[in-house]
């Protein structure tokens, strides 16, 4: 067990170093609520975000970017063909697609669109809260709009089903994060109880997952670890959600190898 934990820590630390060296470009088809938060988080960590929504530029963008993040948070029927075209271009250029199925299960449109995107992607990582993961697997979860009422543990079976169905990695985010891959599952116990009170925190995790995928860490582990540790550090310096939002950017920017290793809680 310790050997596996040590190996995972090395993977996380190495991925962060590589990301900061390479500064990968990440194409984000994101939502209006999350765009500013996710772009700033990517910049703070060392990646380069571009918020691209036009079909007319998507083929070109995916030819030189490192990964594609598709976030359905403010879904509109006009966006769906663009999202699917972007996934098609990512497939052509062998780029990883990170799907954030925001509110999957809250409406039939969100659920059907999430299924379409998951089925279309060749190299896929799914990042969602427990209720979204459960709904994406075709089960009935408990949600309140885009917020999960299910525990991360309750979604493990659904995550394994998605992993096997789409040959992908699945990140379940919540009070406890789980990474589910062909190699098994990893549990992360970092983060802070204040984090859910800042909008787009999950969207930020999806964006960071795309950045790490662009440099070869294609499980979501490094992104979840880095955001969890940075969230803890930021919360210690914050009086509430407003200051947490700002302090998180500083924590991502300042996060170093020693602090990351010291604070990681993996099992």
Curated annotation (Swiss-Prot):
Q: In which pathway does it act?
A: Cofactor biosynthesis; thiamine diphosphate biosynthesis; 4-methyl-5-(2-phosphoethyl)-thiazole from 5-(2-hydroxyethyl)-4-methylthiazole: step 1/1
Gene (UniProt)? thiM
The top EC class is: transferase
Q: Which cofactor does it need?
A: Mg(2+)
Instruction: Keyword check for Repeat, yes or no.
Output: no
Organism encoding this protein: Psychromonas ingrahamii (strain DSM 17664 / CCUG 51855 / 37)
Q: What task does this protein carry out?
A: Catalyzes the phosphorylation of the hydroxyl group of 4-methyl-5-beta-hydroxyethylthiazole (THZ).
GO biological process assignments: thiamine biosynthetic process; thiamine diphosphate biosynthetic process
Question: Which reaction(s) does its UniProt entry say it catalyses?
Answer: 5-(2-hydroxyethyl)-4-methylthiazole + ATP = 4-methyl-5-(2-phosphooxyethyl)-thiazole + ADP + H(+)
Q: Which family does it belong to?
A: Belongs to the Thz kinase family.
**Name assigned to this protein:** Hydroxyethylthiazole kinase
EC number(s) per UniProt?
2.7.1.50
Q: Which residues bind substrate?
A: 51, 200
Q: Which Pfam families match?
A: HK (PF02110)
Q: Name one GO molecular function term.
A: hydroxyethylthiazole kinase activity
